[in-house]
């Protein structure tokens, strides 16, 4: 493995290649894709990325389709909140 420093973090493996601004963009993406997320089924922080858009919970063993780099996409969150709001209006 290549040496990483405090400043560059996970993108230290690229060395001086590709330019600083591109490495900063990739750093943001790689940190979010390697992070563990909270499972929406069991509530534990065990949701990890298996492949592009496929997320697996190590606790309840659920496999969920999500975003490519993050568990929830912004459009999915918007749709979920709209559905929840419509259900609440229907119940009233």
Curated annotation (Swiss-Prot):
Disulfide links within the chain: none
Domain of life of the native organism: Eukaryota
GO CC annotation: cytosolic large ribosomal subunit
Positions with a binding annotation for Zn(2+): 39, 42, 57, 60
GO biological processes: translation
Zinc finger (C4-type): 39-60
Subunit structure comment from the entry: Component of the large ribosomal subunit.
Function of the molecule: Component of the large ribosomal subunit. The ribosome is a large ribonucleoprotein complex responsible for the synthesis of proteins in the cell.
Family, as annotated: Belongs to the eukaryotic ribosomal protein eL43 family.
Listed name of the protein: Large ribosomal subunit protein eL43
Organism this protein belongs to: Xenopus laevis
